[in-house]
Structures are given as C-alpha cells and as structure tokens.
Amino acid sequence: MESVVQPSVFVVDGQTDIPFRRLEQNHRRRRCGTVQVSLALVLLLGAGLATQGWFLLRLHQRLGDIVAHLPDGGKGSWEKLIQDQRSHQANPAAHLTGANASLIGIGGPLLWETRLGLAFLRGLTYHDGALVTMEPGYYYVYSKVQLSGVGCPQGLANGLPITHGLYKRTSRYPKELELLVSRRSPCGRANSSRVWWDSSFLGGVVHLEAGEEVVVRVPGNRLVRPRDGTRSYFGAFMV
C-alpha cells in the first residue's frame, strides 16, 4: 500500500503584525521630517523679518538724530528754496523786441514791440519807448542793437562814434541820466561802396525807484536794423 506524503506545516504563535507596524513607523517619520523642515523655514523667515525691522528702526533713529542737530533754518530749507523760486518767478520782468516797424522814433528813443513773438511785460509797463518800473529795487537792464550801413556813415568821418546808451528818467532830475553807454565806429573797416554790419550790447545792475523810466537811444537811429526781433532787443528784470 502506497504511503501519502503530507506537506510540512509551520505554525507561528506571535508577532504576526510586525511588517504592518514597520510601515506605520516609516509614515510617522516622514510626517515628522516634513513638519521639522516647515518649522525651520518659518523660523528663518521670522528671523529675516526681525533683522529687517531692526535695520529700519536704526535708520529711523539715525535720521531723527541728524534732523535734531540741524539748525532751525535748515529744517525749512526745502520750503525756503521753493518760496525763493516762486518769488523769482513773480519778480517784475520785461523783454521787448525790435520787430515793430515803428522801432525808430523821430527825435526820441527807440520804440519797441511789447506783445508779438518773444516780447512780454510782467510787473513793468511800457510807454513811448520807455520801460516804467512799478516797484523799487535793483534791476538788471540790458539792450542790444543790430547796426548796418554802407561805407562810413555821414557825420562819423570826423571820428564821431555811434553811441548806444541806456538812460534813466526820474522826476527828481530834469534831464535823462546815463546808465550804460557804448560808443563804436565802423569807419575804420568800411569804405564808400561796401555794406558793413555791427552790433552793440549793454547790460548791468542799477537801482530804480517806482515810477522811474529806462529808455534806449541811438542818435544814428537810421543805422539800427530791427530784423526779426532777435537782433535788436531791450529788457529788464528785478534781481
């Protein structure tokens, strides 16, 4: 009779859940590692914000110390600068041009354009060639005239120069007073057949009272060339 072979059977009595416990421990370790990394990042961010706040606080304190040591006038320096700029913009000023066809007055001062092109009046008035001040003070007055002719002008051959001058009219004196005068002659470089060109510029600071007038005179006014208003001009502004 044939014998039957039975398979071997092994019986384990305890610790049947060891593999499952190991898997659970690995998951817990991973979760703890993630929490630790997140906490470290939060701590670094907090430290950075704290450092930045400390530097800003120190900067604010240093600026406060600097301002505290400034003189009283220094605290309002920017306001004073702005006020000065505004006051300069409001100062009396005028620029007149020679673009007007009536530039040359017969027997009188040169006449000027007050509105067209670059010409303007601000805080000053104009009357028959004269700039009239409305406020007393120091003014920079200036004038430029473009001169032209053919050969030596009649009357200059004897050595008399062309006179270009700024003159003041005041109620305290019966005659015009010289402020600035230039004298020049083209006869040394001109002959009877050639056209010559020349220019004269005057400028300086003078004191004027309210109501006083400043005019420009060129006795040989037929030599003045108005042109386009940029060659001959007259102006003043308070300094």
Swiss-Prot record:
Membrane-related topology note: Single-pass type II membrane protein
Stretches in topological domain Extracellular: 59-239
Glycan attachment positions: 100, 191
TM regions (residue ranges): 38-58
Topological domain ranges for the Cytoplasmic compartment: 1-37
Disulfide bonds: 152-187
Subunit relationships: Homotrimer. Interacts with TNFRSF14.
Function, in words: Cytokine that binds to TNFRSF3/LTBR. Binding to the decoy receptor TNFRSF6B modulates its effects. Activates NFKB and stimulates the proliferation of T-cells. Acts as a ligand for TNFRSF14/HVEM. Upon binding to TNFRSF14/HVEM, delivers costimulatory signals to T cells, leading to T cell proliferation and IFNG production.
Protein's name in the database: Tumor necrosis factor ligand superfamily member 14
Species for this entry: Mus musculus
Source lineage: Eukaryota, Metazoa, Chordata, Craniata, Vertebrata
Gene, per the UniProt record: Tnfsf14
